[in-house]
Curated annotation (Swiss-Prot):
Any one GO molecular function term: metal ion binding
Domain Globin span(s) in chain numbering: 2-143
Keywords: Acetylation, Cytoplasm, Heme, Iron, Metal-binding, Transport
Subunit structure: Monomer.
Translocase recorded as keyword: no
Protein name, UniProt field: Hemoglobin-1
Localization, UniProt: Cytoplasm
An annotated GO cellular component: hemoglobin complex
GO biological process, alphabetically ordered: oxygen transport
Signal peptide positions (record): none
Organism listed in the record: Phacoides pectinatus (Thick lucine)
């Protein structure tokens, strides 16, 4: 992964801040994603049992989804210097999402929202965009 040391440090430190607040931040991230991309929210209709978008933020299903996503991003951040682990994680992630009919474009949209969202936690949007690009480089071939 061709990230500078400063980019990696920023991603790690900003993720530590966001992760510590993820009980609140996680649902906020997903609501930002859903508000920006109705097509992504539609992919969660089974999880939320067809509930309206405005009603899902404080549900147990949202809490579980947010924690699952936190674990995924934490694994990616923890392995920024371990290309083999990242590649394996990305292959599994791609297979799981492809099986649910989620497109590479929808994943890219989620990464874009995440990059902007992380600014609230001291994240550099360019660093997060670089990480997203590197991850998508491993995800896209498996979609």
């Amino acid at each position: 992964m061709s990230l500078s040391a400063a980019q990696k440090d920023n991603v790690k430190s900003s993720w530590a801040k966001a992760s510590a607040a993820w009980g609140t931040a996680g649902p906020e991230f997903f609501m930002a994603l859903f508000d920006a991309h109705d097509d992504v929210f539609a992919k969660f209709s089974g999880l939320f049992k067809g509930a309206a978008k405005g009603t899902v933020k404080n549900t147990p299903e949202m809490a579980a989804q947010a924690q699952s996503f936190k674990g995924l991003v934490s694994n990616w951040v923890d392995n920024l210097d371990n290309a083999g682990a990242l590649e394996g994680q990305c292959k599994t992630f791609a297979a799981n999402h492809k099986a649910r009919g989620i497109s590479a474009g929808q994943l890219e949209a989620a990464f874009k929202v995440l990059a902007g969202f992380m600014k609230s936690y001291g994240g550099d949007e360019g660093a997060w965009t670089a990480v997203a690009g590197a991850l998508m480089g491993m995800i896209r071939p498996n979609m």
